[in-house]
């Protein structure tokens, strides 16, 4: 058991206040390649500079070949350590070993349309993301504080039905975080991470037509913690569950493959030797570019499971690369961008690699790149078969809280997907378009339609007193940049139909700015909610329900003014605010509030911190429901104003009472 690594997320609880209110140290800046030119010249330059390469990456042919590869890496590492020791005159002092540090848009492409109504604010239509509330027939399914709940909503009802633990009956849930949940047909999947058992935990539950839940099975996957302050570890396309897990390897180990991802079905008395490797050598790919183990080594695994079978039969594909990573899923492919963890020398984070894993089971391909994306919203695989990525010169991925502390120059990488190969070639300098660098450190970005929007705000820290900041709007097809002034920081960017909305604080008040995305992008309107702050920071905390080409209603959790962003881990939102959008002009229609005085002790045993938040605006079949902790508050619109219709409590005690 990985007892040494239990405190990683737990330690953060005591350190969070200090970390997110401290002044962020300015990181060294590395210039990204940025050139502009006509497409003909760029294309010619790209072709002329390409080296001969295979179309896809090569997997190891045998276990022996893979082990020989690791032995070679280890030997090269030892020689490099000796060389540095002699050069520095400090022979015998070991080099820093980062490899064993286990501490822990609106889619432009025609995404597959989901016939079922979605209640999750996803990056791509048809690509669901692991969250805390989902819809199953006439029932809401909620994951909260280590338990699963169902609430009946059919025929106008709002009634708690069922509650079960989000883990097996014989599992000790201590030191385990149950973070994400997805629903496929009559299967509920819970994704968690266990420091006690050392890996990703996948729980399968049955849900029937009446909304009753029952436990089916649990599987453990050997991995490091997947947690990201912004990203989600799992996706669902149709019945296909896709989840990403990193595993940091020790290149000094005699056989690093002993640490490879493995799975076991949980039962009482389960032993470590029951783990069965799910990634054979013939499914481990590496690029032709040499890996520098001095900056860390990781196995990035994408596991795909067909939930239509009712079991946990999965295929896994893995790539070897640097440890820094960002995981992105488009309707067509899975992308993993890896960045070296190098903290010395003049070329920090200059070498990166992006891997493409098609969902049609074709072999992975790769491309050498520079810098690092901020998070999954830095990506767009567009319908013209290009990968568009915003990169910063000083970033290391979005694991844990890495996305909250990026810095450096900014560029837009736009490269044809056809340029990916076996990793021999790098993206051309013509593929990068230099962009203005905003002031500030908490960076937000989002692709909406044919535009990329970005800026900086307060994020997880204390609200900054910003009476004005820059919002940059980039046409990703031609690179034209518009610089807009907003009267607040940029803490959230969301699609508003074919336009956008930017949310941020001035230190005391919460601002909502609508952005018209046309030939000349512009700020169309601003609404100010005085004395408020965002109650949720994750993308799922927001939802916009259109009811016309240029109209609809949006919902966002709000809290008290001046609250630091990280407090959403501990505090429930005070209310969910609803605004009406009419041609990019906002009007408040009201809010649905929490009644915190009614809160009761839920006897929480597991996952007692809301890492993924606890409040959501829900628009379901013409109804509006605010999820505020254990409360579900339904509202109705009368004369353009929100009025509370009813509220229910779905806590464990309330479910018992409701069931009689």
Features from the language model and the residues they span:
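Bacterial N-terminal signal peptides
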Residues: 14-33
């Amino acid at each position: 058991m990985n007892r040494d690594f239990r405190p990683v997320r737990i330690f953060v609880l005591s350190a969070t206040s200090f970390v997110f209110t401290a002044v962020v140290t300015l990181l060294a800046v590395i210039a990204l390649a940025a050139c502009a030119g006509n497409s003909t010249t760029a294309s010619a330059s790209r072709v002329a500079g390409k080296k001969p390469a295979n179309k896809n990456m090569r997997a190891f042919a045998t276990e022996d070949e893979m082990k020989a590869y690791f032995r070679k890496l280890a030997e090269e590492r030892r020689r490099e350590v000796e060389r540095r020791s002699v050069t520095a005159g400090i022979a015998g002092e070991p080099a820093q070993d980062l490899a064993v540090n286990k501490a822990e848009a609106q889619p432009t492409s025609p995404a597959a349309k989901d016939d079922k109504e979605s209640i999750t604010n996803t990056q791509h239509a048809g690509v669901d993301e692991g969250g805390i509330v989902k819809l199953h027939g006439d029932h809401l399914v909620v994951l909260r504080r280590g338990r699963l709940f169902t609430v009946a909503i059919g025929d106008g009802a709002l009634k708690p039905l069922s509650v079960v633990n989000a883990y097996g009956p014989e599992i000790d849930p201590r030191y385990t975080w149950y973070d994400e949940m997805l629903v496929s047909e009559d299967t509920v999947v819970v994704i968690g991470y266990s420091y006690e058992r050392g890996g990703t935990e996948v729980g399968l539950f049955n849900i029937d037509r009446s909304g009753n839940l029952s436990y089916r099975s649990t599987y453990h996957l050997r991995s490091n913690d997947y947690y990201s302050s912004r990203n989600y570890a799992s996706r669902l396309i149709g019945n296909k569950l896709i989840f990403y897990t990193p595993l940091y390897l020790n290149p000094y180990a005699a056989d690093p493959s002993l640490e490879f991802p493995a799975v076991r079905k949980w039962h009482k008395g389960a032993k470590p030797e029951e783990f069965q490797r799910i990634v054979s050598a013939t499914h481990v790919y590496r690029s032709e570019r040499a890996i520098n183990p001095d900056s860390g080594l990781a196995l990035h695994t994408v596991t795909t499971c067909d939930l239509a079978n009712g079991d946990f039969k999965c295929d896994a594909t893995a790539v070897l690369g640097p440890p820094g990573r960002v995981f992105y899923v488009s309707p067509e492919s899975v992308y993993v961008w890896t960045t070296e963890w190098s903290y010395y020398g003049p070329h920090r984070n200059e070498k990166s690699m992006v891997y493409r894993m098609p969902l049609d089971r074709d072999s992975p391909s790769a491309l050498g790149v520079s810098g690092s994306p901020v998070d999954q919203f830095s990506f767009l695989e567009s319908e013209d078969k290009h990968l568009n990525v915003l990169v910063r010169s000083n970033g290391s991925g979005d694991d844990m809280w890495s996305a909250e502390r990026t810095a450096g120059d900014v560029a837009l990488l736009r490269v044809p997907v056809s340029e990916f190969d076996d990793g021999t070639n790098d993206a051309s300098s013509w593929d990068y378009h230099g962009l203005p660098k905003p002031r500030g450190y908490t960076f937000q970005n989002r692709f909406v339609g044919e535009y990329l929007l970005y800026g900086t705000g307060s994020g997880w820290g204390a609200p900054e007193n910003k009476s004005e900041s820059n919002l940059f709007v980039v046409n990703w097809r031609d690179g034209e940049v518009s610089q807009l002034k907003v009267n607040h920081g940029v803490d959230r960017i969301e699609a508003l139909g074919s336009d956008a909305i930017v949310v941020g604080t001035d230190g005391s008040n919460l601002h909502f700015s609508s952005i018209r995305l046309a030939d000349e992008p512009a700020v169309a309107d601003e609404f100010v909610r005085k004395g408020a702050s965002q109650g949720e920071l994750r993308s799922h905390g927001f939802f916009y329900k259109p009811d016309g080409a240029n109209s609809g209603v949006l919902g966002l959790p709000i809290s008290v003014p001046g609250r630091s962003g990280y407090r959403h881990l501990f505090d429930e939102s005070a209310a969910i605010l609803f605004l009406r959008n009419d041609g990019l002009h906002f009007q408040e229609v009201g809010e649905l509030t929490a009644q915190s005085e009614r809160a009761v002790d839920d006897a929480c045993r597991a996952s007692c911190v809301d890492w993924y938040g606890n409040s959501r605006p829900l628009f379901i079949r013409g109804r509006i429901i605010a999820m505020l902790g254990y409360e579900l508050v339904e509202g109705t619109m009368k004369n353009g104003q929100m009025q509370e219709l009813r509220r229910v409590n779905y806590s464990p005690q309330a479910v018992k009472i409701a069931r009689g």
